[in-house]
Amino acid sequence: MHFSLPTSRIVVVVPAAAICIVCVLIETCTAARSHVYTIPLRKGKETSFAETVGEPVRTNQVNVSVEEQKNNIRGRPGLGYYIEVDIGTPPQKLNVLIDTGSSNFAVAASSHNAISTYYRRNESSTYEDQGTYVKVPYTQGEWSGDLGQDLVQIASLGNQSFQANIAAITESKMFFLNDSRWQGILGLGYAEIARPDSSVEPFFDSLTSQTSIQDIFALQMCGALASTNDTNLGSSADGPVEEVIGSMNIGGLDASLYHGTMQYAPLRDEWFYEVIMTDIRVGNDSLGLDCKEYNFDKTIVDSGTTNLRLPVRVFEAITNAIKAHTTKHMPDVPSEFWTGMNLMCPTDSTSPYEPYHWFPTLTLDLQSTNQGQAFSLVVSPQQYLRRDYDHEDKKNCFKFAIAPSTNHAGAVIGAVIMEGFYVVFDRENKRVGFARSTCPGACEKTGTCVGNSPLITEAFNIDFDASDCGYDRSTSYDPALTITAYVLAAICLVCLIPVIVFALTHQINKRCKGRRGRGVVNHHRLDQEGLAENEPNSDP
């Protein structure tokens, strides 16, 4: 599943075109740049996280503690995590996918064979049609529909309701997933990537502007690290996979959901939740690439994408390094496993978890908010080897949860990585926080954890400016915009040709007239001189 928007802010610089016509040099310079629209965010009073952890979330009508927001999201491996919302008057209950990689709030508004219910806007007395068509393509799937507004409530926030922009999905392609149990998507990104444009206020902006809820939320998604009491992670021959449980804290943090110190990465920009990756290690060995390679053309934290996605060169490097670690223990891993096209189904394992022992940990280093420092996310094999079940052969299998990015989508820290951590989206202070999740603690107690549990290190010094690792989009190349720029330049040139021809004709005519005039004068002077020479000399 990959519901990150294929959006890239591009600044295209078209080189000057020099065209010479009849020794006249014409230079046409065209620059094309995408427009940036900004919707001001509501900014509350400055507070430290110590003040928000475990405190009540204040709204216009009720007080809700973050303690009451535990286990309010559910998910299924590979199909995303969702939260229950009430929409309209009277309320209609729907489940929506939690997606930090997009910014539109959209729900099904017509029947579909992959969903059990949908939003009936004609039955809501508070629905308002905005008369705007919206279409959102993702790197996987797309949907289109009509933009409107209605009252929305999040069940775990009590009876608090607010007016939100809602896209009523009337058509979709490869968007709704069988057995996913969600009927819409909750985009939690910034206004800049909202569709059709940034004038559409995103869900979380509406929530914080209409209530006194602080501009922060956090996600704990347990996934592969939950105990067997909380989930049955692989599909079974007896039925579909069970759901996993997690928590979404809105307006504050729950200290009981993480261990140790929270480490923060600064937001590079407010569109996606973009951070900067400074290095990747397999086991103890760095991939050794220029750090700009890791962030080509961005690195984002995206709950709506299942896998860890990496730029092609980085994907090839990390895959080769993992192969080198595992080949001596598991020489028969099919090549299609590494590309995600096939499952790995061990036949001689004494335990369905044994392959975890032969795969290395991965370490993702991120820029820290502490100047001149970075911190590490240590990723367990349990996270990037997703358990799956082969119904045909009735085997426990594994799927490689690292994939190459497509269409310059950049690096995506998806759900399989986030599942090891308590992840904080501190919009008010423009940073993303990571701490070790309490989810692994459950499986440690029951003895079901295998391999290295996810870890997070303290911030450490680096001898370079991490900001230099960010990809410079100001020199990015977009063929479509470049072609448009050249077409406009050609139109300008066509318009200039008549002016140039007229100017040249005028100059030529002027010079020709001047030459004819000088020719008459010279001829007259020669005639006079000739007459003078032929006259008789009157001197004695």
Curated annotation (Swiss-Prot):
Family: Belongs to the peptidase A1 family.
Record key words, sorted: Aspartyl protease, Disulfide bond, Hydrolase, Membrane, Protease, Signal, Transmembrane, Transmembrane helix, Zymogen
Keyword Hydrolase among record annotations: yes
Ranges for domain Peptidase A1: 81-435
Residues on Cytoplasmic side: 504-540
Protein name (record): Beta-secretase
Pfam families xref list: Asp
Top enzyme category: hydrolase
S-S pairs: 222-439, 291-469, 345-397
Name of the gene encoding the protein in the UniProt record: BACE
EC number, as in UniProt: 3.4.23.-
Signal sequence annotation: 1-31
Entry membrane topology: Single-pass type I membrane protein
Any one GO molecular function term: aspartic-type endopeptidase activity
Matching PROSITE patterns: ASP_PROTEASE, PEPTIDASE_A1
Taxonomy, superkingdom: Eukaryota
